[in-house]
Every structure is written in C-alpha cells, then in structure tokens.
Amino acid sequence: MSAIALGMIIFAYLCGSISSAVLVCRVAKLPDPREHGSGNPGATNVLRIGGRTAAATVLIFDVLKGMLPVWIAYLLHVSPLYLGLTAIAACLGHIYPVFFHFKGGKGVATAFGAIAPIGWDLTGLMTGTWLLTVLLSGYSSLGAIISALIAPFYVWWFKPQFTFPVAMLSCLILMRHHDNIQRLWRGKESKIWDKLRKKKQKTPAEEAAELEEKEED
C-alpha cells in the first residue's frame, strides 16, 4: 500500500466521522438525533425530529463526506482496490465516528456519495432504484436495502474492477439495517411520509410508547 492510498483511507475515515446530523441539530437547536426519534443520527431521523430543511442539509453533507475523499483518491490515481477501501473507510467513519463516541448512522447517504465518483450512469441508476422503491413502498429503509443488494450488479456491469469493494460496502449497509429488516418483516417499520405527520401530531403518550417499542427492539 502506498503512502497516498493509506493517507486517503485515513482521511476518508476522519471525514466520515464528522456527524452532520448531530452538528446540524446543534446549530438549529434541535434535539440530539442519537437520543430522539429512532436514535439514528441520519437524514431520515432528522426529518422526523427537525423537518425537511434540516434533513436535506444533513443528506447533502453526508453524501459529500463520502464523495470528496473517493474523488480525491480517484484523481490521485489510487488503484481500484484502495479506492474501494477509501469508500469503505468513509462509511465506517459515519457508522463509528471517532469524534462522537463511535455512535453513528447507517451509512447509506455516505455510501451513495462514495460510489458516485465511479460514474454518473451508476449514480443515476442507484438514485432511480432508491426513489422507485420508496415511491412504491413508502419505506426509506427498504429503498436503502434494495439499492445495497443491487449495487454490486450495477457496478459489475459498468465498472467490474470495483465490484468487490462495492459488494463489501453493500454488506456493511445491510448489516446496519438488520433492525429495519426485522421491523419490515413484522410490519412495524414507519413510512417516510408518516414521519412529518407524526412530528406534527405526536402526543407525549405516543412518544413514550415509541420509546418503549424502540427499547423492545
């Protein structure tokens, strides 16, 4: 491994460790996403507790912190294997952030940003897959799961040299969605457009019930 490749992997992990959900909520004086809603510091949970603007800001920053290190590594002609490890490092930083006691999100937006530099055709397919799944089902988590399952096949078709690293990345995303898969199977997963409705209508009793359900999970 060259010094440049090692440096990019470390840089990617540190970029991923910047929890935009926590920082945006602090700036906007919103509740800590690690302690409210689903407890996941990501854009979907910020949508629940803070609304669309805060969620969109988190989403953009989460995508960029995956995209930036991989793009720089790509421009520095890092080999495909280490380029893939750079992408994985960014996602690991998001999931286990060194700056936030290793309690992070699920890495979907960061993984999407990390895959984007491979090609815009692939990016378009991934976006379309996620959007179509969410529009048909209403479940953001299902969109992420389906996209993670299909991503290695898309990459194999367009850029086969990146198939193995992207497959590893997909496995990481699927592992982080273990609880969501169980809730989907039991029919207890909440739909994405229900989140704003719940934010407006939720009573203290409902919040207590949601917290109890979360503890049972």
UniProtKB/Swiss-Prot annotation:
The chain crosses the membrane at residues 4-24, 54-76, 80-102, 112-132, 138-158. Pathway: Lipid metabolism; phospholipid metabolism. It comes from the Bacteria. It catalyses: an acyl phosphate + sn-glycerol 3-phosphate = a 1-acyl-sn-glycero-3-phosphate + phosphate. One of its GO terms (molecular function) is acyl-phosphate glycerol-3-phosphate acyltransferase activity. It is a multi-pass membrane protein. Belongs to the PlsY family. Catalyzes the transfer of an acyl group from acyl-phosphate (acyl-PO(4)) to glycerol-3-phosphate (G3P) to form lysophosphatidic acid (LPA). This enzyme utilizes acyl-phosphate as fatty acyl donor, but not acyl-CoA or acyl-ACP. This is Glycerol-3-phosphate acyltransferase. GO terms for cellular component: plasma membrane. HAMAP family: PlsY (MF_01043). Keywords: Cell inner membrane, Cell membrane, Lipid biosynthesis, Lipid metabolism, Membrane, Phospholipid biosynthesis, Phospholipid metabolism, Transferase, Transmembrane, Transmembrane helix. NCBIfam families: glycerol-3-phosphate 1-O-acyltransferase PlsY. It is an enzyme of class 2 (transferase). Probably interacts with PlsX. Its EC number is 2.3.1.275. InterPro entries: G3P_acylTferase_PlsY. It is found in: Cell inner membrane. It comes from Yersinia enterocolitica serotype O:8 / biotype 1B (strain NCTC 13174 / 8081). GO terms for biological process: phospholipid biosynthetic process.
